[in-house]
């Protein structure tokens, strides 16, 4: 086991896990305070994490109301190694769906997601870390 790391930046070994086509779990906060979890695709932009989603989905509405979020990524082949990224989010429109196209390539090799259509109101969630926990 490589060890444990905690800071506000993503270490190289954790970046390699994020850059791989591993699914992630996004945690947001429901209006009543309960956690809401979603399986997502993501990519890195420096130490920020980018997630494509759709305007009007529960996770998007939760983040517009309360921008705090956590993402957990672990490899299917070794779930005792993981990176947890806690922070705050911003949301920007992605009218051309550029991020979902990149993520579809990364995760499936296809040009677009199975349920993605050109008129889907896509947004990009940018998670800026306040704390990164890496156990490798």
Regions found by a protein language model. Give the residues of each.
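Charged, gly/pro-rich active-site loop segments
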Residues: 1-9, 79-136
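Short, basic/aromatic recognition patches
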Residues: 2-24
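Short secondary-structure boundary segments
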Residues: 54, 75-76, 129-130
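A generic secondary-structure signal marking the coil-to-beta-strand transition
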Residues: 14, 22, 47, 81, ...
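Short beta->alpha linker loops
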Residues: 54-55, 95
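Short, surface-exposed beta-strand-loop junctions and turns on beta-sheet-rich folds
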Residues: 57-59, 78
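Short beta-strand segments
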Residues: 21-54, 69-73, 83-84
